[in-house]
């Protein structure tokens, strides 16, 4: 590399002698030159300085380098992923799917709104248990092809542990306990302030997969949401760009739309490619510890493609604290390894009642 001074700045370029020795490097240099030429031309159209282009590529490259993951973490996530489940239901024309994971023994955790979709609208909660048992089933082996009939577990007519505000529900598996995957509750850990997280679930009724995401820190949530809205609301609003449904339009969101997420200490926010069907997915930190359950997000359509302003999951610490507070007998009996050490868990949580788009998949009846 050689350097050249100009207007108080230093620019680096490859010496021709070095490029002559490495033909592949010469090709890559040409690609980079072309890339920056296009970027400079676009910056000129937008009235931006060339320095803004350099800043942009520095930031993008920095983000990519920080997404690297140790192999030992990949191996750990591979083991933990065995406990992630695919839950599907068919209830009198009401079909859908979502994600869940084994909490401990025969109990699985998923979102309260998922269970709400299983039972359908207008059903009293006292009748939910029976409908869940008749309509839904769970498998942990959907990793490639759609599982065979002998790979599924039924759900017991049991619905006793749930919370609408933290959007969680505990369901009970039926069958041979020796065939259930290991529970994840003992790996629960407080939310990370920043860094990487990994979601393992079944987006879009697909086989089990993982998505690495960057945490949006609490102090950046408001800015990230507002910048996202301002950037994409500049375009014209029409059916082609925003979709035919009002709720899918970026222009429907305002600065007040995200207050309950922005100011909620019990959620972790991030940007993920997991959309429909991923509610109930376990969320792990960079060390493979269970920090949250993926819940929902604010989505919109742009140019016929689905995008998200922000996605979030509720803290496992908050979920366990709510179970301990409201269902203490069950907590102490079913989670004996935790209740003696859980005194430091926060027992209170903020109300969370804003409307949001749930990440579940509902089939369209024709």
Can you describe what each PLM-predicted range is?
Residues 1, 16, 42, 168, ...:
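Residue-level detector of intrinsically disordered, flexible termini
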Residues 20, 34, 38, 42-45, ...:
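Polar/charged alpha-helical tracts
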Residues 60-64, 71-97, 102-105, 109-276, ...:
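Serine endopeptidase catalytic core focused on the charge-relay Asp
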Residues 11-13, 22, 57, 107, ...:
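Sequence-level detector for tyrosine residue identity
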Residues 3-4, 23, 159-162, 175, ...:
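Intrinsic disorder/low-complexity signal
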Residues 1-98, 362-365:
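Protease-domain processing segments flanking chymotrypsin-fold serine proteases, especially trypsin-like
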Residues 9-13, 243-252, 259-268, 273-275, ...:
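C-terminal subregion of chymotrypsin/trypsin-like serine protease catalytic domains
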């Amino acid at each position: 590399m050689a350097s050249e001074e100009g207007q108080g700045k230093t620019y680096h370029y490859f010496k021709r002698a070095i490029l002559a020795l490495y033909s592949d490097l010469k090709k890559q240099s040409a690609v980079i030159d072309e890339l920056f030429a296009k970027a400079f031309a676009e910056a000129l159209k937008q009235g931006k300085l060339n320095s803004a282009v350099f800043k942009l590529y520095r930031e993008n490259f920095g983000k990519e380098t920080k997404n690297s993951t140790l192999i030992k973490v990949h191996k750990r996530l591979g083991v933990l992923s065995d406990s992630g489940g695919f839950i599907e239901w068919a209830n009198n024309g009401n079909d859908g799917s979502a994600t869940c994971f084994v909490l401990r023994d025969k109990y699985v955790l998923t979102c309260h709104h998922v269970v709400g979709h299983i039972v359908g609208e207008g059903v009293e909660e006292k009748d939910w248990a029976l409908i869940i048992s008749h309509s839904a089933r769970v498998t942990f082996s959907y990793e490639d092809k759609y599982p065979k009939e002998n790979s599924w577990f039924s759900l017991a007519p049991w619905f006793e542990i749930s919370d609408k505000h933290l959007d969680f529900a505990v369901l009970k598996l039926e069958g041979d306990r020796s065939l259930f995957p290991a529970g994840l509750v003992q790996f629960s850990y407080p939310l990370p302030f920043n860094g990487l997280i990994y979601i393992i679930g079944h987006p879009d009724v697909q086989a089990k997969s993982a998505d690495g995401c960057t945490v949006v820190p609490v102090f950046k949530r408001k800015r990230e949401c507002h910048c996202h809205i301002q950037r994409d609301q500049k375009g014209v609003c029409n059916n082609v760009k925003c979709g035919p449904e009002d709720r899918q339009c970026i222009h429907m969101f305002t600065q007040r739309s995200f207050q309950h997420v922005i100011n909620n200490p019990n959620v972790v926010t991030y940007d993920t490619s997991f959309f429909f069907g991923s509610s109930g997915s376990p969320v792990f930190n960079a060390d493979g510890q269970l920090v949250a359950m993926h819940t929902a997000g604010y989505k919109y359509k742009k140019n016929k493609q689905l995008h998200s302003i922000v996605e979030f999951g509720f803290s496992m610490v908050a979920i366990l604290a709510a179970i301990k507070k409201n269902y203490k007998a069950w907590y102490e009996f079913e989670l004996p390894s935790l209740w003696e050490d859980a005194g430091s868990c926060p027992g209170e949580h903020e109300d969370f009642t804003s409307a949001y788009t749930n990440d579940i998949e509902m089939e369209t009846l024709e």
